[in-house]
Amino acid sequence: MEKSSETNGYLDSAQEGPAAGPGEPGTTARRAGRCAGFLRRHGLVLLTVSGVVAGAGLGAALRGLQLNRTQVTYLAFPGEMLLRMLRMIILPLVVCSLVSGAASLDASSLGRLGGIAIAYFGLTTLGASALAVALAFIIKPGSGSQTLQSSDLGLEDSGPPPVPKETVDSFLDLTRNLFPSNLVVAAFRTYATDYREVTYNTSAGKVTIEKIPIGTEIEGMNILGLVLFALVLGVALKKLGSEGEELIRFFNAFNEATMVLVSWIMWYVPVGIMFLVGSKIVEMKDIIMLVTSLGKYIFTSILGHFIHGGIVLPLIYFVFTRKNPFRFLLGLLTPFATAFATCSSSATLPSMMKCIEENNGVDKRISRFILPIGATVNMDGAAIFQCVAAVFIAQLNNVELRAGQIFTILVTATASSVGAAGVPAGGVLTIAIILEAIGLPTHDLSLILAVDWIVDRTTTVVNVEGDALGAGILHHLNQKAMKRGEQELSEVKVEAIPNSKSEEETSPLVTHPNPTGPAASTPESKESVL
């Protein structure tokens, strides 16, 4: 009897008789086919990584030409087009994916998966903050740098540090953004509290200055409000039943069409990344001075990202799934390269959705439900960078942090990182909130701004890695729950098989199909134990 031919190229040679020689046409054709298949599956990954390397080489080669600001802007134009295309697709992708994802899950699954996701995001961010504080106390990045000034770095054009906000106002802004007053405005503007100083002259001749909070709208998508609205809308459509099916199908079709657009944009990613990285390297005035002056701070932040992203998060994934986390991460090289080049979790969301579904087989209902939420609220890398920066500034000012202040850093970094998405200089603004909470000056934030472009790249990679591994864990737990449900259902069916006529007569709630065949015509004979 002939065996069916396998499609695996390694098995074909064993079944087709004697092995062909290295120069024979059969072996060459098979090798060419395998190479073509490999390039077809991993071509985009190879091109994206090559774009990062080529961008670094391009920037290093052009630094000697002393390009002016206008020429650097022209050089960055292809990269700017990539960012604009990715940001263009974020709004329909987030809204449609969350509506279709929430509508495709039943209420119990939605609550269970949502609870697991919130616990995962909160605990990993808190763990990242604790790791960062521990590393900062061990390495002491601020020791010996007390005389360092931002003017020494040649980066006066990095802009002034953001005006610090009161901690209470920051959390109130977070709540306000969860419930936008206008969904159209929320697509491109975010609520933020500003301050106006009012001077009062008292009767005693004293001058009193009062800082009054004023509500303003700043540029940037209010992703928090859109996420909450899309989730609630999906649940509401699910509750409507048959009346909401038409609208659910509309959002599903809109989501699929958006993913097609994403697949087209992804082929432009290598070109855009090359010019983004190259222009940023050309733009820096003195990289060597920057690294040597703030080297310990940069090293501490990147080391924290490496430990959390390379050890802690993969270990959590392995504990829950018992699978190789690095094989899972290998299918996400394109989103990681995009995150490294764009420094934006939201801009990486389209490529992350595409790769995690196609390369890693994560259920679309899981990925399209959890990834938009993770891109908004899960900021492990940002928490590490913010906690290291807070301890660094405390050491610069010779301030010994007490236990209460350390606890405040951990809680504030974990909570305020949720609202950092969509806000310009959001990470540095969060550091200002932390410094205000523990009573430290904010004038040294310009040093953090000077190296933000370096640290922010590994920060974004760790952020999106945490989202992806969280989606993988939820996918595994959901598959496990489904198998358990099928097993329980099969056990119920086995127990419902009638064993005697009396069981059928005394079980009016269980109906059985009429048996057919010879077994049905003869009664079941049983041995009497008497």
UniProtKB/Swiss-Prot annotation:
Its main location: membrane. GO terms for biological process: L-glutamate transmembrane transport; L-serine transport. Glycans are attached at N201. Residues 16-28 have a biased composition (Low complexity). Keywords: Acetylation, Glycoprotein, Membrane, Phosphoprotein, Symport, Transmembrane, Transmembrane helix, Transport. It is a multi-pass membrane protein. The chain crosses the membrane at residues 42-62, 88-108, 119-139, 217-237, 257-277, 298-318, 328-348, 373-393, 418-438. Residues 1-28, 488-530 are annotated as: Disordered. InterPro entries: DAACS, Na-dicarboxylate_symporter, Na-dicarboxylate_symporter_CS, Na:dicarbo_symporter_sf. The modification Phosphoserine is found at S507, S525, S528. It catalyses: L-threonine(in) + Na(+)(in) = L-threonine(out) + Na(+)(out); L-serine(in) + Na(+)(in) = L-serine(out) + Na(+)(out); L-cysteine(in) + Na(+)(in) = L-cysteine(out) + Na(+)(out); L-alanine(in) + Na(+)(in) = L-alanine(out) + Na(+)(out). Gene3D superfamilies: Sodium:dicarboxylate symporter (1.10.3860.10). Residues 140-216 are extracellular. Pfam families: SDF. Residues 1-41 are cytoplasmic. Belongs to the dicarboxylate/amino acid:cation symporter (DAACS) (TC 2.A.23) family. SLC1A4 subfamily. This is Neutral amino acid transporter A. It comes from Bos taurus.
